[in-house]
Amino acid sequence: MNFKELDQFMNQLPERGVPACELAVTLEGKTVYHEVVGYANVAEKRPAARSDLRWLFSCTKVMTCIAAMRLVEEGKIAISDPVSRYLPEYTHLKVKNKETGEITDARETLTVAHLFGMMGGMDYDLKAPGIQEAIAKGGGTREIVAAMAEKPLHFEPGTSFRYSLCHDVLAAVVEVASGMRFSEYLDKIIFTPLELTDIGFVPTAEQEKRFAETYKYDNITRELTLYSGKNEYWLAPEYESGGAGLFSTVTAYSKFLTALANGKADNGYVLLKPETIRMISETDLMTPGGRDGLHESWPSRFFGYSWGLCGRVHLDPTISFSAAPKGEFGWDGAACSYCLIDPVNRLSVMLGLNVRGYTYGYHMLHPHVRELVYAGLNS
């Protein structure tokens, strides 16, 4: 292994609009690369460190999907189940016609598969009246997710793709199927068995002091400004967002990814059975309409990829021109963090960033880091 080119690229990132970056790579359960560059606070010149915390944003979705798949594995959830089996509020849904604006009863049944696959017809409108009313009443996960069912869907379930609150709804399904709060279930099957301490939904006072600053990038002027907002997906004190609610260190999240990629943790704990990991690696959830919607949403990000049971899933390396094998899966987040699970090579990659609006990151940085990792492993 030779990661010289990866090192060079990492050291160039502060010049490319990335104030701080941390990258952890594991192979066959062992860390083979872990580097931190830049400043956790640019104004104070505080160097980034492995103890830094950051909001994972949509990398949370990977953990939510894995938690749901654990329940699928145990027979407590079926992917084909109607969501209404767990959440009665989703029994009678409405659909708004895109062309006419007419609102009618949904003809198709919303299923758990549609939640996994972002084909539920939902959106990311956090200001919807029903959601705001539930927040004002002090609602938690179940109450706020129930309110999400009030807004008409953008299309019939299963007929297209739209990145949305589907995984927040999936977290509520996990709560019902497990009989536990979402955070309690994650603690039971992931945090405690994997010995993860610096991860969760609500940071302690000590942890708040260790958060790296989040910045906003202007893609036209290429200027960075301090991002004054918090995690806007933390809707209420008792709300646990399955779509974007977790914070973590790169080290803690990397241990989670390693348990999936390697088939077990370094302490021997098995999070998911090999056949479940194989199912995630091989499942493409997209219907023809879903595939059209996916590529319409992200025209240049899914060549050779589709959307499956845990975010993106690699289907065809001859189209993606990637060294990653078929079956690699993972996702990214609003502040440009990125994760990869490669069960074939037992490889995991966790890239931690804190930059909002960094378009370059999704289209260029992520795939480039991925290819440099594989090049380093093979050199």
Predicted segments, located by residue:
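Short, surface-exposed loop or secondary-structure junction motifs
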Residues: 93-323
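Short, conserved catalytic-motif segment at the N-terminal edge
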Residues: 2-56, 76, 92-101, 366-367, ...
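Generic C-terminus detector
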Residues: 353-379
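Active-site SXXK
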Residues: 4-10, 29, 55-83, 170-175, ...
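Acidic helix-start/capping segments at beta-turn-to-alpha-helix junctions
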Residues: 84-91
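Short clusters of small/polar residues that mark proteolytic maturation junctions
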Residues: 36-38, 82, 228-229, 353
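Short, well-ordered beta-strand elements
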Residues: 339-340, 346-355
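Short glycine-rich, acidic/polar surface loops and turns
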Residues: 298, 310, 326, 333-341
